[in-house]
Structures are given as structure tokens and as C-alpha cells.
Amino acid sequence: MKKKKPCIALIADEFTTYGLAPDADILPLTPFDWRWKLRLFKPDFLFVESAWRGYRNSWQGKIASYENKPDNNNELKKIVEYCKRKKIKTVFWNKEDPFHFERFSDSASFFDIIYTTDADSINRYDSLLDHRCQSVGVLMFAAQPHWYKPVPQVKRKYGVAFFGGYYGNQF
């Protein structure tokens, strides 16, 4: 018997969406359609990442904190509160730690479970949240085997590839 895929209500950028899609039924949420989608599809859990844009750019500027927009994450908070009332687990993944911890920590504080890509940020979440969430843990980036399959070795010209970001003089 084939195992049923989990249904994930998702607020994420494209990279994460594509990574999860082969293993889950994805329900992309926007600030405009989340009410009817959550009522109709009853997901297994809500997964929100530290997205800069989200599905079709609908979350741009609505998850990260900005000084000139103090209430920009109100819609996200409403979604999390709805999910908690309906007993839907809520998960936040900050893939921008440690550099953007402050930018996403307010939104992260709404959730039951918080994941970070930086083990050193766990204590920061624990002290910030005063143990309001159920757990804080590490969730590293991964490769989706469906998209990144090993291929037979062929003779290649080797070069250099850099995957990362430039943060100037922050350290």
C-alpha cells in the first residue's frame, strides 16, 4: 500500500516549494486566499519559511520585520491563530539565521515549532520566546532526490562554484 503524502499549507519561496512538492501535497497560501483554502483542504500542518516573496510574490514584505512597517505580519498572525484554533500544527523555518534573526524573529514567535539553519540561534529563540513554542530545532538545507539524482560519471572540465551570500563587514 502506498503511503499517503502529507498535505502542507505552505508559505515559502519557489526553491522550498519545489523541494517539498515531490513528497507532499502542497497548498500554497496567499494573504488573499488562505481562509477558503484552509477550510476546504484541512492540511496536516502549516509550514512557513523566512520567505522574502512567497507564492507569486504575494508575501513580499509581509513576513520579515521592517521599521517603517510595524504591523506588516498581521495577516500571517491571523493565519497562525486560525490554524491553532483548528488544531493544525504550525511550523516556522528561518533559513536566514543568523544574519537575519532579528528580521524574522517576530513572525517566528507566533508558531508552535521553530526550525533554524543555525544551531547557534537555538538559544536566541529560547530566550526570546521564553519557551512559548513547543520546540526549537535545526533543519538544514537538503537536496531533493527527485530533482537532484546522481548521474553516471562523465568526463568533465572542472571549475569552481560558490553557493552562498555576501554579507560585507558584518563579522
Task: Identify the role of each PLM range.
Residues 78-81, 98-112:
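Membrane-proximal helix-turn-helix segments that form the acceptor-binding/catalytic region
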Residues 91-105, 141-147:
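Nucleotide-sugar donor phosphate/pyrophosphate-binding loop at the beta->alpha transition
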Residues 1-41, 50-61, 66-72, 113, ...:
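Nucleotide-sugar donor-binding catalytic core of glycosyltransferases
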Residues 18, 68-69, 73-77, 87-100:
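Conserved nucleotide-sugar donor-binding subdomain of glycosyltransferases
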